[in-house]
Amino acid sequence: MLIPFSMKNCFQLLCNLKVPAAGFKNTVKSGLILQSISNDVYHNLAVEDWIHDHMNLEGKPVLFLWRNSPTVVIGRHQNPWQECNLNLMREEGVKLARRRSGGGTVYHDMGNINLTFFTTKKKYDRMENLKLVVRALKAVHPHLDVQATKRFDLLLDGQFKISGTASKIGRNAAYHHCTLLCGTDGTFLSSLLKSPYQGIRSNATASTPALVKNLMEKDPTLTCEVVINAVATEYATSHQIDNHIHLINPTDETVFPGINSKAIELQTWEWIYGKTPKFSVDTSFTVLHEQSHVEIKVFIDVKNGRIEVCNIEAPDHWLPLEICDQLNSSLIGSKFSPIETTVLTSILHRTYPGDDELHSKWNILCEKIKGIM
């Protein structure tokens, strides 16, 4: 059953806070099932942060159900350039988010369900959570071949991944979250989670590729709505709580004091890109010159998302050495970003003489450099 998480009743449903807040009073005796009314990844991730940081989960676990508009979500210690096609994402308006848990990169859209299981650190148990999801799916489709693996994934028919998993363990609280593919755009997923960038050297956590499949490909009745209700029912049964899904607005400061500042932080360039572990790009590309090709070599070190070392080499007969030197100097300290690079190269472009051929080569070089960002 879905009920609105209104100001009238929310105060009596939620757990005690570790710190005082106007939005919460009284207690919940056992546990709670929440579902977000927002499809914004940053606000939904902020709910995870808020519950982890502020709620007393002792004897009162929480299940949080949420879905997002098209988004690629990377793990805390990952490199987005290594994990996904950022250029395609920009073209298609797909968001990029970095979560606070580890693990690999996943694609979210409205055909994917996200489940977050909150407990105390002592009660944290990923395998039990996944077994609960398996029971929920089998309750709807008894003959469904779905199993949890030692890697804490869920496999359909022994080979197709329908759920990936990640977690965060704090001093007292912990959460385990996982995806559940019901009707995700599989073609789009595959295109977005394929990095086109060459020559990246990084110690960042790398995702493990896997064959994926939607539950609806197996059984068209396994829609997101059906699966959400099944998981909620099984969770309520397992934890002996009321089978009510409480709808929440993750932007409501009266219920979640301070939550919007958490969402804003998760949207910043400094968090999404700046938290990328140090990496380098060592690559080259060719450009046409007088019916032949010349090679441009590029070596860039990136730290905290900013260019620390830049060495772009082009043959003297194609582009004067001093121009490459100016470009290298200008890029050092800037964001490893096509937007910032466009601004910097446009400023430099104005300083060169009105030579059409030189300007053409300059534009070609700059477009190639932006293409690796």
Swiss-Prot record:
<feature type="binding site">
    <location>
        <position position="210"/>
    </location>
    <ligand>
        <name>(R)-lipoyl-5'-AMP</name>
    </ligand>
</feature>
<keyword id="KW-0808">Transferase</keyword>
<keyword id="KW-0012">Acyltransferase</keyword>
<feature type="domain" description="BPL/LPL catalytic">
    <location>
        <begin position="57"/>
        <end position="243"/>
    </location>
</feature>
<feature type="binding site">
    <location>
        <position position="208"/>
    </location>
    <ligand>
        <name>(R)-lipoyl-5'-AMP</name>
    </ligand>
</feature>
<comment type="function">
    <text>Lipoyl amidotransferase that catalyzes the transfer of lipoyl moieties from lipoyl-protein H of the glycine cleavage system (lipoyl-GCSH) to E2 subunits of the pyruvate dehydrogenase complex (PDCE2). Unable to catalyze the transfer of octanoyl from octanoyl-GCSH to PDCE2. In vitro, it is also able to catalyze the transfer of the lipoyl group from lipoyl-AMP to the specific lysine residue of lipoyl domains of lipoate-dependent enzymes but this reaction may not be physiologically relevant.</text>
</comment>
<dbReference type="GO" id="GO:0017118">
    <property type="term" value="F:lipoyltransferase activity"/>
</dbReference>
<dbReference type="GO" id="GO:0005739">
    <property type="term" value="C:mitochondrion"/>
</dbReference>
<feature type="binding site">
    <location>
        <position position="179"/>
    </location>
    <ligand>
        <name>(R)-lipoyl-5'-AMP</name>
    </ligand>
</feature>
<comment type="pathway">
    <text>Protein modification; protein lipoylation via exogenous pathway; protein N(6)-(lipoyl)lysine from lipoate: step 2/2.</text>
</comment>
<dbReference type="InterPro" id="IPR045864">
    <property type="entry name" value="aa-tRNA-synth_II/BPL/LPL"/>
</dbReference>
<feature type="binding site">
    <location>
        <position position="161"/>
    </location>
    <ligand>
        <name>(R)-lipoyl-5'-AMP</name>
    </ligand>
</feature>
<dbReference type="Pfam" id="PF21948">
    <property type="entry name" value="LplA-B_cat"/>
</dbReference>
<dbReference type="InterPro" id="IPR004143">
    <property type="entry name" value="BPL_LPL_catalytic"/>
</dbReference>
<keyword id="KW-0809">Transit peptide</keyword>
<dbReference type="GO" id="GO:0016410">
    <property type="term" value="F:N-acyltransferase activity"/>
</dbReference>
<dbReference type="GO" id="GO:0005737">
    <property type="term" value="C:cytoplasm"/>
</dbReference>
<feature type="binding site">
    <location>
        <position position="151"/>
    </location>
    <ligand>
        <name>(R)-lipoyl-5'-AMP</name>
    </ligand>
</feature>
<protein>
    <recommendedName>
        <fullName>Lipoyl amidotransferase LIPT1, mitochondrial</fullName>
        <ecNumber>2.3.1.200</ecNumber>
        <ecNumber>2.3.1.-</ecNumber>
    </recommendedName>
</protein>
<dbReference type="InterPro" id="IPR004562">
    <property type="entry name" value="LipoylTrfase_LipoateP_Ligase"/>
</dbReference>
<feature type="binding site">
    <location>
        <position position="107"/>
    </location>
    <ligand>
        <name>(R)-lipoyl-5'-AMP</name>
    </ligand>
</feature>
<dbReference type="GO" id="GO:0036211">
    <property type="term" value="P:protein modification process"/>
</dbReference>
<keyword id="KW-0496">Mitochondrion</keyword>
<feature type="transit peptide" description="Mitochondrion">
    <location>
        <begin position="1"/>
        <end position="25"/>
    </location>
</feature>
<comment type="similarity">
    <text>Belongs to the LplA family.</text>
</comment>
